[in-house]
Amino acid sequence: MFKNLARLGLSLCVAISAASHAKAMEMQMMPSHHSPIGIMGDHLAMEDKWMISVRLSRMAMKGNQLNGDSILDQDVLQQSNPYASVPNMPMELSVVPQDMTMDMLMVGAMYAPSDALTLMGMVMFNTKEMSLATYNGMMGRSYLGSFDTSSSDLSQASLTALYKLYKTPKHRAHLHLGFTQGVGKNNVMDKVLTPMNMQAVMTLPYGMQSSDRSRRLTVGITNVSTLGGYRLGNQLLFDTALAKKSWTYGDQWNVNSWVQRDFGHDLSFSARLHYKSQQSINGRDVSIMAPVQTANPDNYGGQVVDFAVGMSVASNMFGGNHEKIGMELVLPVKQNKRGLQMESNWSFILGYEITL
């Protein structure tokens, strides 16, 4: 009898020890438990858990393209100026964007009131800088000089609900429903060099503004599956303006597909394909009139395909077991932008996540 009880007790101890070890392994964040750092809202948190995230990104653009084909500055100067009827305006475009950078800081927080629902809030701050070249607006079209413009402000704030559709050991999916409010300025002004070789202070074009100040709705779905040692994910998001201002960015679709693999408990690598389709700007700001392509609301939107490679590392920077540092390099594969726009060059994303 005593031997049987001893065996039973030993079996229970082994079972409890194994369960505790399994629970500890479950609680320790594997790098691929969360998707590549460029994906937002990729998972639900456990009930009553918080997750804080910080993302830094830089996007670089250089050169120009017309309806998807690269063109030189001289080709840009032959394009008609839609504001030619305005007094003292040249007939053709006379200011040509050379390069642009956009730096973004995104701070987010997630909280799960239940295992089926996670709430996600995010604020974004961005800084934009652009270099441009000015040419004579009359005969000769000689080069006059270059100048830089910039804007920096809190851009937008959003609140999103993630609702679980299903979750099994190898498959999970959830829905997205989010609202975003543009809070940054949409009338930033800066000093420019005009085709008359004079400096003037003007309202910057749409792409240089911090936001369109619209209220937007985002709906979508995310699913992640485990296949052998790989995690495969897909995310589809649709974004549209609800409360429009004098001008708003067009509706857009974003589709992401990625594959991710762990290497040990601390490291994972990922590859991601991103497709974006966006309509042109709705409306117009009558104060934005200049002989430059970015002042024309028709020269926005289009279709782009990007390819990203990333790495995620489990970290204990602040002494926790639920920290991750991720990074991604994003390169354009295909750019079919609407009208005359700058060409995308590359993007880099660096992020940190911690679950509390």
Go through each PLM region and give its residues.
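Repeated loop/turn-to-beta-strand initiation elements of outer-membrane beta-barrel proteins
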Residues: 50, 116-119, 159, 168-171, ...
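Outer-membrane pore/translocation modules
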Residues: 124-241, 294, 302
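Outer-membrane beta-barrel biogenesis signature
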Residues: 22-80, 162-164, 183-187, 210
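Extracellular loop and loop/strand-boundary signature of outer-membrane beta-barrel proteins
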Residues: 39-40, 91-95, 142-149, 203-209, ...
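Residues that define the transmembrane beta-barrel architecture of outer-membrane proteins
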Residues: 48, 101-105, 143, 151-157, ...
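Transmembrane beta-barrel strands of outer-membrane/channel proteins
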Residues: 52-58, 121-125, 175-181, 234-238, ...
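Residue-level signature of outer-membrane beta-barrel architecture
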Residues: 45, 56, 111, 123, ...
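Outer membrane beta-barrel transmembrane domains
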Residues: 65, 71-88, 244-356
